[in-house]
């Protein structure tokens, strides 16, 4: 069905968050029109990690089984000291973990998640997808939202959901706060398994923590590839953005770590470079018939691997808020915001703190290692209950 005004809901952005939002609307029978600025379908990036909360959200969106077919189910997670190669922390994510949180922990190629969502969108007759359509101007009345794209086209909707990322045009129009450039740079690459060191081909996300830097690797696509994510504190004044990376630059930041993890930096044929950013959490991101979702609402650093996970949660919560509000957008958007602000702010701030833990040096490194080495898996599970224990039936609980 269309909205009571005979107009679709406009969604700015066709990434994971935008597609998930469209599916949430589709499951309510609400027509949606996705405005994606890219001329082609697809997601940049490489591997991502999906916690139990992400799988709960995928199930609620009707794509859980499809996503599971592409995922690699890991056996544990490890944090290693990149200087002396000792294991700092070990957390099993097998059967005990699954029983605790109701879903698995897995790694997956970002493009595979996007593809599953996009295929489901194409199968949903109430969703229209427009490429090469960049939001340029937004106006809101009591009855509708009007979007002008960068080619002068006009799109009228009953509501607008901004899913347009860290540098959201929708957020700029209604909030206008600055991006917080972290000074941390992330390099990402995918390496074929045949070229990856045999002793590091583990069925686990493994992080090597060094001073002001760390590396993460884990398998993708049935173990045929390995994802490599490398983070360091830049010596330069950075501006948020994505570019091609330089092997010389990335290797120059890891001279102080052990040879075993450092060898990984020589493997990729090419790198992509992200100068990362987040924003300060805000208490309001719904404005009448306009709301924000995913990175547009709560951009976060990568240290908790929750960017995609929280966007999926957002979409499900938005659908639940619409159900509880009889598809009346203004109260539904307020209810959705009320249910998400505190939780997502906690993730944003916790991700920053986890970056400090990963990159500890000097005495802080020694304290971190001593605190975590003797920690039992159950204590890690308890500490992560607030994050991984998210449930759809509690989505509207603030």
Model-assigned labels for residue ranges:
Residues 2-9, 26, 51-173, 177-192, ...:
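Conserved N-terminal helical subregion
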Residues 6, 10-39, 161-162, 187, ...:
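Conserved mid-domain beta->alpha element of the FAD-binding
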Residues 40-56:
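Conserved N-terminal glycine-rich FAD pyrophosphate-binding loop of Rossmann-like flavoproteins
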Residues 181-184, 201-204, 259-275:
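A short coil-to-beta-strand element that immediately follows conserved catalytic motifs
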Residues 193-200, 237, 324:
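Short helix-loop capping/hinge motifs at secondary-structure junctions, enriched
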Residues 203-238, 247, 254, 276:
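Active-site substrate-recognition segment that forms the wall
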Residues 241-272, 329-330:
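Flavin-binding catalytic cores
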Residues 373-398:
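C-terminal auxiliary extensions adjacent to catalytic cores
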